Amino acid sequence: MTSVSDCFAQLRDRGQCALIPFLTAGDPDLATTASALRQLDASGADLIELGVPYSDPLADGPVIQAAATRALQRGTRLDQVLEMVTELSPEIRAPIILFTYYNPIYHRGVAEFLQQIAKAGVRGLVVPDLPLEESENLLQQAADLGIEVTLLVAPTSSKERIEKIALRSQGFIYLVSTTGVTGMRTKVENRVQDLIADLRQVTDKPIGVGFGISRTEHARQVMDWGADAAIVGSAFVNRLSEGSPSQGLSAISTFCRSLKSSLLLDA
């Protein structure tokens, strides 16, 4: 499994935009999550974001909140998620990016948490409620273990703050496409194009756009605006949760292939 940065570099050399699906670990169960990760890896996902279920997911919309609740009710905990990733990571090509809120990191201890996820094979980390001003310790310790911590840029961020985030973010920069929480929306707001342009003025790091990207035309739109990755969450979580596990796995595989096709330059 390559690093997040190396994956983006390889895609950039080929002139391709990355597809980053998101799944909630443990919904409907960890065995299905493992199968889903394999399916996504085989169906065109370039990197995969794996959410650790949390009881108070402030950045997540109703679809992902419901998935986290179901996973927690089934007893899914961080240790079990990491056991699954440990077994799975040698099998798949796409780097795994762990998405978790800061509270579980704090309670486990930054050093121990990072050592455990590095041992499991995690290559990237997104912590949506980590303030920029408090990120340095986590960023440094993670870098020492080969884990790239990606920071988020909000639509309301000032240009000065955007520049600071771009300087510190590792792997890529996560551009939030809309104010509010994650979820499926009908269109991508036009101001995302301006935000991508603002970032391009201060960094050459890859830019991934997420929150509200739920259709093939959304993914194509952000690529045409200059993004290096389309991050798709609720639409995958929703498809996996509908019907039986086998039906959900088939649905996300088909959707993943469709999204990846839309991101190819000759689509």
Swiss-Prot record:
Record Pfam families: Trp_syntA
Entry EC no(s): 4.2.1.20
Positions of the catalytic residues: 49 (proton acceptor), 60 (proton acceptor)
GO cellular component, one term: cytosol
CDD domains hit by this protein: Tryptophan_synthase_alpha
Recorded GO MF terms: tryptophan synthase activity
Reaction catalysed by this enzyme: (1S,2R)-1-C-(indol-3-yl)glycerol 3-phosphate + L-serine = D-glyceraldehyde 3-phosphate + L-tryptophan + H2O
Top-level taxon of origin: Bacteria
Entry keyword set: Amino-acid biosynthesis, Aromatic amino acid biosynthesis, Lyase, Tryptophan biosynthesis
Protein's pathway: Amino-acid biosynthesis; L-tryptophan biosynthesis; L-tryptophan from chorismate: step 5/5
Function (record text): The alpha subunit is responsible for the aldol cleavage of indoleglycerol phosphate to indole and glyceraldehyde 3-phosphate.
Family: Belongs to the TrpA family.
NCBIfam families the record matches: trpA
Subunit structure: Tetramer of two alpha and two beta chains.
Record-given protein name: Tryptophan synthase alpha chain
Gene designation: trpA
